[in-house]
């Protein structure tokens, strides 16, 4: 166990410069070297060879740097994990809805929602369209045409039934 800065634990087996640069946001190689030089330590110093007094010096210097007052803010890993988690949630929702994950939804959503079928079983597609709500323009057109045809067919059947009733009464 090396230096513990807030929630950040620096690896004791690696050089402090590399660990500062890797784990604390806002610290690059030059800043890490300056911090260690200001504390009066050697640049190639490893975490397991540090004394408590040297750790305190490094902590004080880090706190004095502008923009690094709150050194717990500098957790790169946690910050990136939060962002990735939110991105993944957003992407997951978009994938479920059938929308493109990023980009234009006015026209791209139509392409994203199309079902690629080899060969083209149109009858199966039409049956699928009738079972669920249409999701894009093409499906809506087909859905509306089929509905109109069904309505016409139903009207004709009703007319035929009425005419048969009249015929039987005569």
From Swiss-Prot:
Keyword terms of this UniProt record? Mitochondrion, Ribonucleoprotein, Ribosomal protein, RNA-binding, rRNA-binding
Q: Which domain of life is it from?
A: Eukaryota
Q: Which GO terms describe its cellular component?
A: mitochondrion; ribonucleoprotein complex; ribosome
Ribonucleoprotein is among the record's keywords: yes
Query: What is this protein for, i.e. what is its function?
Result: Located at the top of the head of the small subunit, it contacts several helices of the small subunit rRNA.
Q: Which family does it belong to?
A: Belongs to the universal ribosomal protein uS13 family.
Note the subunit structure. Part of the small ribosomal subunit.
Name of the protein this chain belongs to: Small ribosomal subunit protein uS13m
Which source organism? Answer: Dictyostelium citrinum (Slime mold)
